[in-house]
Amino acid sequence: MKPVTARKRSGTGATVNQMELRPENSEHLQLIRAYEAGSVQIGESFYASSFLLAPARSPVEWQVEQFSQINESDFAEILTLSWDVLLVGTGDQHYLPDLRLQRMLARAGRGIDFMSSRSACATYNLLALDGRAVAAAIILPLRASAVTGR
């Protein structure tokens, strides 16, 4: 939301500053509209498997089912994209990569943050709406217990 200019309230003798909020024009951005345990809505489409996302690019499937399986080749495609910050949603919990993967990603010379997939979805939208060069690699499901029925 973008602030609109303050207004002067008349008739009371006092000056009151009001801020009116209007939605930003985000039609051209690929944004996450909703998420639940087993799926994420981007625009009008729902995704039930892991995906890669950038504001100016349609989501593509990411062949990662759980963070423990992740390896260097899983980042090959996303490292070719233009971004300053990569958010890696690690699934239902927050995990950090092993030392080998950390070294490989450090060589990319760009910011990479690991967080739960739910947090990555929310953070992605904030950065995209702020005009940041962001990309996201989201592992689904967001919450294992909801998917398995526990």
Language-model region placement:
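Conserved phosphate-binding catalytic cores of ATP/NTP-utilizing and phosphoryl-transfer enzymes
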Residues: T123-L129
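Short acidic loop-to-helix transition motifs that present clustered carboxylates
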Residues: S117-A122
